Amino acid sequence: MSDNVIDKLYSIILDRMKTMKEGSYTVELIKRGKHYVAQKVGEESTEAIIASLVESQQRFVEEVSDLIYHLLVLMALENVTPQDVYKELERRMKK
């Protein structure tokens, strides 16, 4: 596992999916399913936008962190890895 915090968090999410650790928020999300997690991504996106417009920079950072976490859970449910996203971003940078 790399030192990248995104990769570390994704690995933890995969572990939670595998072990279904009781009391884990990640497990709660997984049990509720992809549609629920997708809805949470939308909610967190809206909260990040609002924070960027009318709240502090720290609050914006917190909301972006929530958004990234929920995106990673959705990615795990879709079997998409951070490396898949890194590869696509690198491809786009070459254009």
From Swiss-Prot:
Enzyme Commission number(s) of this protein: 3.6.1.31
Alphabetically sorted, this entry's keywords are: Amino-acid biosynthesis, ATP-binding, Cytoplasm, Histidine biosynthesis, Hydrolase, Nucleotide-binding
What top-level branch of life does the organism fall under? Archaea
**Involved pathway(s):** Amino-acid biosynthesis; L-histidine biosynthesis; L-histidine from 5-phospho-alpha-D-ribose 1-diphosphate: step 2/9
The compartments listed are: Cytoplasm
User: A GO CC term?
Assistant: cytoplasm
What molecular function does GO assign, one term? ATP binding
One GO process term, biological-process aspect: L-histidine biosynthetic process
Looking up Pfam families in the UniProt record yields: PRA-PH (PF01503)
Which reaction does this chain catalyze? 1-(5-phospho-beta-D-ribosyl)-ATP + H2O = 1-(5-phospho-beta-D-ribosyl)-5'-AMP + diphosphate + H(+)
Q: By its UniProt entry, which InterPro entries does this protein fall under?
A: HisE, PRib-ATP_PPHydrolase-like
Say where the protein is mainly found.
cytoplasm
Q: What is the similarity comment for this entry? A: Belongs to the PRA-PH family.
Q: Which PANTHER family has this protein been placed in?
A: HISTIDINE BIOSYNTHESIS BIFUNCTIONAL PROTEIN (PTHR42945), HISTIDINE BIOSYNTHESIS BIFUNCTIONAL PROTEIN HIS7 (PTHR42945:SF1)
Name of protein: Phosphoribosyl-ATP pyrophosphatase
Look up and give the organism this protein is from.
Sulfolobus acidocaldarius (strain ATCC 33909 / DSM 639 / JCM 8929 / NBRC 15157 / NCIMB 11770)
Q: What is the lineage of its organism?
A: Archaea, Thermoproteota, Thermoprotei, Sulfolobales, Sulfolobaceae
